[in-house]
Amino acid sequence: MAQHAVYFPDAFLTQMREAMPSTLSFDDFLAACQRPLRRSIRVNTLKISVTDFLALTAPYGWSLTPVPWCEEGFWIERDDEESLPLGSTAEHLSGLFYIQEASSMLPVAALFAEGNTPERIMDVAAAPGSKTTQIAARMNNQGAILANEFSASRVKVLHANISRCGISNVALTHFDGRVFGAALPETFDAILLDAPCSGEGVVRKDPDALKNWSVESNLDIAATQRELIDSAFHALRPGGTLVYSTCTLNREENESVCLWLKETYPEAVEFLPLGDLFPGAERALTAEGFLHVFPQIYDCEGFFVARLRKTAAIPPLPAPGYKVGKFPFAPMKGREATQITQAANASGLQWGENLHLWQRDKEVWLFPAEIEALIGKVRFSRLGIKLAESHNKGYRWQHEAVIALADPHHANAFELSHQEAEEWYRGRDVYPQTAPSADDVLVTFQHQPIGLAKRIGSRLKNSYPRELVRDGKLFTGND
């Protein structure tokens, strides 16, 4: 694999020499940083099992090497990457996998370690959504996830990835993560804080990542991280699990932040060792039980993961002074709820008791029941999934609901050919050789729902959202 020139400040190299255990070679560290990063994917088990995914993609000649800490994770090598980007393959467009760096699969593995089954989880810094979607898959779309993102421009990307992966148990918020300790005290069974950091671990992906690096900047970032972990710890219920992670390598932003929390709340913080998280984890284990992953250890990005338990309640923060405002939705019950449920079922859309119907004007939504207790305490950007818009003749089912809820084996399902599916993703109407008998058609490809269509004569009218329409080379090259 080709080398690429990485910029290293002298002070950074000095710091790394001091931070690196004597069991590791500094020359190996430098060599690993100069190698381009191996690409990796995570199979979305909400859509397909790992076994079925491997069978489906076997004809493509992809080389898939298992990621040791994530059963659904694989490093991937392909011969046709230049002619067909991984993100344009049929399997990616239909949400069967997520392009995710192997190291970033570690925090969620830690969150669910030792049989942990949290019902209500917060992802404090969620965009672009790799870990939120991984959490949702581990929860099998049950319970609820509050996915927060401070950057307004990244909230849209977060929602797009959640929607593509068929996730229904997420509520989105757009706040500075430091507000949650006061706004939602002792609310969550588990919290992931993948903290904003100096990004020292990503030089294999971005050789210029350290151009603006300085010790002073790292200390400023660490101060923010302490405020974030303090807020997250307040929002965690006693007995709950907090995973703290970064994609950086210095101790100030990693071990020191966790040790500061333990010094601040000595009776309430317990470090949960991660040495048994996966075979070989002990190679990255610190004295405190954290994983400090230098890039040469597993040939991946540099990363840090710590797992903590809150063993006791701590004094609450002052209640926030803001007003959330009137909640614009009302629960949908009785005959109305029965009517839309029956209509949805008839169109191939189904959901369980963990999702509840809510209404705003002509919009009908499904909210995760586990999040309803938070309504009125915090303002949501988006809650659950939009199911439908009602109109005089019935309901207009929404694309995100189809992707999350549709049964691909329903009587109205119609399987497209490779060429027809490519036309669909380009936003064009489809003219199948044999038209379906139903007027409202659940369009599938590889037996995965990819949208709804109206049959008009021999034509299937495309309803694929305009903002998702693709051009350039698509996946017919996989034939």
Curated annotation (Swiss-Prot):
**Recorded GO MF terms:** RNA binding; rRNA (cytosine-C5-)-methyltransferase activity
Q: Where does S-adenosyl-L-methionine bind?
A: A125, A126, A127, P128, G129, S130, K131, E149, D176, D194
The UniProt keywords, alphabetically, are: Cytoplasm, Methyltransferase, RNA-binding, rRNA processing, S-adenosyl-L-methionine, Transferase
> Known PROSITE patterns for this protein?
NOL1_NOP2_SUN (PS01153), SAM_MT_RSMB_NOP (PS51686)
Q: Where is the active site?
A: C247 (nucleophile)
**EC top class named in words:** transferase
Reaction catalysis annotation: cytidine(1407) in 16S rRNA + S-adenosyl-L-methionine = 5-methylcytidine(1407) in 16S rRNA + S-adenosyl-L-homocysteine + H(+)
The record, for Pfam families, names: Methyltr_RsmB-F (PF01189), Methyltr_RsmF_N (PF17125), Methyltranf_PUA (PF13636), YebU_pre-PUA_dom (PF21150)
Its Gene Ontology cellular component terms are: cytoplasm
Q: What is its EC number?
A: 2.1.1.178
Biological process, per Gene Ontology: rRNA base methylation
**Where's it found, cell-wise?**
Cytoplasm
Give the protein family: Belongs to the class I-like SAM-binding methyltransferase superfamily. RsmB/NOP family.
Q: What does this protein do?
A: Specifically methylates the cytosine at position 1407 (m5C1407) of 16S rRNA.
Q: Which protein is depicted?
A: Ribosomal RNA small subunit methyltransferase F
Give the encoding gene's name. rsmF
